[in-house]
């Protein structure tokens, strides 16, 4: 009975909720079976993307668009090596620019990186429709006046399939989206610089080092921040 899915259940977390609640509780050892029935612990890089929907959280297994996982740090990474992003049929490769995740009060709470799955061997693999957002939380034990550090014990990964239409992640109930837009429009951010440094990062990648300069501008009357990424190094 405990594993039965509630009729009508939909999991539509915001990025802030993923980092500040779900990932934070997992890192602090406060997660339980009920949370893991939604977001299980799994090294997604050891599983073929097409198999991930079958091993997703019991309460989200019927979702045809997106799946969430807590991914533990690999042993090779803990020993100072680069984590593997290769499966039997292909590999995950970072794409685009990594970026910060902010809370509603404009506090940096984590970082997000996007990856795409390619079949075959690097660097000549064939791009697929499988994508992933990987989230890391900021280490809150570090003095706030110092350069933010990312915690590595676990990351939270959202795996999804690109369909050409708006992503499921952006199709939360209208009430939720309207509230977020109102909150976003109320935030006025002055020019800010921050840097995120941590130990080794991956994806067929090397060490992570983000140096970001952020400007808030308004374009076409929309209260959306535009980001100027400078000296960014996160392969």
From Swiss-Prot:
Named from the GO MF annotations, one term is: DNA-binding transcription factor activity
The protein's matches in PROSITE patterns, at most eight in alphabetical order, are given as: NAC
Gene Ontology annotations for the cellular component aspect, listed alphabetically = nucleus
Q: Which keywords label this protein?
A: DNA-binding, Nucleus, Transcription, Transcription regulation
Q: Which residues form a coiled coil?
A: none
Q: Which InterPro entries match?
A: NAC-dom (IPR003441), NAC_dom_sf (IPR036093)
Provide the NAC domain boundaries. 5-162
| Subcellular location field | Nucleus
- What Pfam families would the database entry show? NAM
Description of its domains: The NAC domain includes a DNA-binding domain and a dimerization domain.
Under which name does UniProt file this protein? NAC domain-containing protein 90
Whose protein is this, by species? Arabidopsis thaliana (Mouse-ear cress)
